[in-house]
Swiss-Prot record:
<keyword id="KW-0150">Chloroplast</keyword>
<dbReference type="GO" id="GO:0009535">
    <property type="term" value="C:chloroplast thylakoid membrane"/>
</dbReference>
<keyword id="KW-0346">Stress response</keyword>
<dbReference type="GO" id="GO:0015979">
    <property type="term" value="P:photosynthesis"/>
</dbReference>
<keyword id="KW-0934">Plastid</keyword>
<dbReference type="GO" id="GO:0009523">
    <property type="term" value="C:photosystem II"/>
</dbReference>
<keyword id="KW-0602">Photosynthesis</keyword>
<feature type="region of interest" description="Disordered">
    <location>
        <begin position="1"/>
        <end position="26"/>
    </location>
</feature>
<keyword id="KW-0793">Thylakoid</keyword>
<comment type="similarity">
    <text>Belongs to the PsbO family.</text>
</comment>
<keyword id="KW-0464">Manganese</keyword>
<keyword id="KW-0472">Membrane</keyword>
<keyword id="KW-0604">Photosystem II</keyword>
<comment type="function">
    <text>Stabilizes the manganese cluster which is the primary site of water splitting.</text>
</comment>
<protein>
    <recommendedName>
        <fullName>Oxygen-evolving enhancer protein 1</fullName>
    </recommendedName>
</protein>
């Protein structure tokens, strides 16, 4: 994912979501 794609999923930071999304998409 790109940073923008990660952010669009509602996360606080790109790094947090790069980890969280594969783990369960929180």
């Amino acid at each position: 994912l790109t940073y923008d794609e990660i952010q669009s999923k509602g996360g606080s930071t790109g790094y947090d979501n790069a980890v969280a999304l594969p783990a369960g998409g929180r």
